[in-house]
Amino acid sequence: MSREQAFEMLIKILCKTDSTDDMKLILECILTRSEMEDLIDRIRIYNELLNTNNSQREVASKLGVSITKITRGAANLQDNNIKDFLRKKISY
């Protein structure tokens, strides 16, 4: 199986998952604790960037993450399609 095929399979598995318990189980099976923490930090970063007027440095300090991670998240939000999608999915 190619990486592309595996990626498509992963997307299908995640899309077919309809309970939070099942999703948690899948994520715990395929991600290391460190990878899970990185994903959680990204969600926290997007939430702060989308829902506050804090500077990137303030967000980094508040969340206890590197300014590099904040800058990467802010760069992703420059794409209006991504920003609109995340705004609909992420809220307080």
Swiss-Prot record:
GO biological process, one term: negative regulation of DNA-templated transcription
SUPFAM superfamilies: TrpR-like (SSF48295)
Keyword annotations of the record: Cytoplasm, DNA-binding, Repressor, Transcription, Transcription regulation
Gene3D superfamilies reported for this sequence: TrpR-like
GO cellular component: cytoplasm
GO molecular function: DNA-binding transcription factor activity; sequence-specific DNA binding
Claim: Cytoplasm is one of the keywords in the record: yes
Location within or outside the cell: Cytoplasm
Superkingdom, taxonomy of origin: Bacteria
Pfam families (UniProt xref): Trp_repressor
Subunit-structure text: Homodimer.
Entry similarity comment: Belongs to the TrpR family.
The protein's role, per its UniProt record: This protein is an aporepressor. When complexed with L-tryptophan it binds the operator region of the trp operon and prevents the initiation of transcription.
Name of the protein described by the UniProt record: Trp operon repressor homolog
